[in-house]
Amino acid sequence: MFVDEVINNLKGNEFLNTTLLTKSNKNKLYYAVKQPDGNIKVVLPFVFENKNFLKLSEYKDGIEGATQRVIEEIKQEIIKKKRFLPLAGYFGRIYKALYEPLTVVNCNLNLGYDLWKVDKYNYIEGDKIYLMLRMIFKEKDSKEIVKQINELCNDLDKFIKKIPIDLLIDEAKNIINQKYLRDKLDELGLVCFIANNSKPARKYTEVRRHYRIAGPKDVNIPFECPEELEPIEIELKYGKKVKGLGIKKKEIFIITGRNAQGKTTLLQAIDSGRDDHLIGDGREFIITTKSLSKASTGSMEMSGQDISLFFQKLPPGIKGSPKAVYGTASGSMYMAYQIQRAIKNKTKLILIDEDNSAVNLLVSGVLSKWFEGVKSLAEIIMEDREKLGDSSFIIVTSSLDLLTALGDRAIYLEDHKAKYLDLTYFREELGRYYLELASKFIGVKIRE
């Protein structure tokens, strides 16, 4: 096979990681295959030595950050200086994932699976970095490909040896600080922390289409915690203090404001706080508990799920009872199940965005009470708060004033900046507004 020819001719290559060249790994881990455009893709494991890597031994808990930084430095050479061209597929459109930048590590979702990133085949150990190189060659002759691989490896070896170790140490410390703060949330009575100067806005590309792995937007308005919310300051493990907004345990925290002000973007950044980020991502110190659930509208086939926290009766066509539902769930039933399951599982933080929600489950109306027998989240907060258990809620609202009024604390976004929302004043204004509406409906002045 072609890959065997390449490997046989690479026997003199000192960087080839032959320990992985087993029969069981052939055509799975390492291979050579023709691409749709006629080019040849060769994937092989290599190992490069740098004695300076030994200085990272003190920072093993952040070693994945140092590894990813090495990979990103190689990518920047590719992008800015047009070096290591086989690793870029000579910039062919279908090969963008090979050199697309990435500023996220330790993401628990299989996002960007085709991006070059730290994993069990790309890592630093001792004085060596192990890299799985995905190379594209226009040539079809195995000897010519081997010649180019040897040149690439020699070039990479020289480049890796010149990467400043302080850059890698700083990145390892950065990851350790994020893990340290996430571990400290419980002790601080928090489920989330948003540091001042964080930059939540994301720039999406053909390859990075999900907010968890997208890079920072070029124009990015930093987050600043309003002083009225009493920002907290936290000292990190490695010589740095961060100040910002802490979301408390069992808190109902509201993010509101007009459309297109960054509410959903901020909520997505909070969700991304479960991951660790490289220096420059902008979300390094948006730190969130990993015990998190998102509730949104949708549909599913139910087979005994419990939604009795919200539903007193079931709509026609749905079998069972609110405690054991059978049939195709509506959007509100599905969302009710998500929230109730999260509470039952003692999930520490539940995220809700009005734009992706069944509104009748968040705030009840007269008709929903008549026809659906739904007890909304707003009613539960007012009357049965204890049924929400120990879960905190961060809820993005725009038009759901009643739910906003029931929050413990709130911010509104204006010009993409966080402003303090005085909920005491807001409740008074909302009460007057409701009285005014009621007076108009029944034609009688209702006194405050």
Swiss-Prot record:
<feature type="binding site">
    <location>
        <begin position="257"/>
        <end position="264"/>
    </location>
    <ligand>
        <name>ATP</name>
    </ligand>
</feature>
<keyword id="KW-0547">Nucleotide-binding</keyword>
<protein>
    <recommendedName>
        <fullName>Uncharacterized protein MJ1628</fullName>
    </recommendedName>
</protein>
<keyword id="KW-0067">ATP-binding</keyword>
<dbReference type="InterPro" id="IPR027417">
    <property type="entry name" value="P-loop_NTPase"/>
</dbReference>
<dbReference type="Pfam" id="PF09818">
    <property type="entry name" value="ABC_ATPase"/>
</dbReference>
<dbReference type="InterPro" id="IPR019195">
    <property type="entry name" value="ABC_ATPase_put"/>
</dbReference>
<dbReference type="InterPro" id="IPR046834">
    <property type="entry name" value="ABC_ATPase_C"/>
</dbReference>
<dbReference type="InterPro" id="IPR046833">
    <property type="entry name" value="ABC_N"/>
</dbReference>
<dbReference type="GO" id="GO:0005524">
    <property type="term" value="F:ATP binding"/>
</dbReference>
<dbReference type="Pfam" id="PF20446">
    <property type="entry name" value="ABC_N"/>
</dbReference>
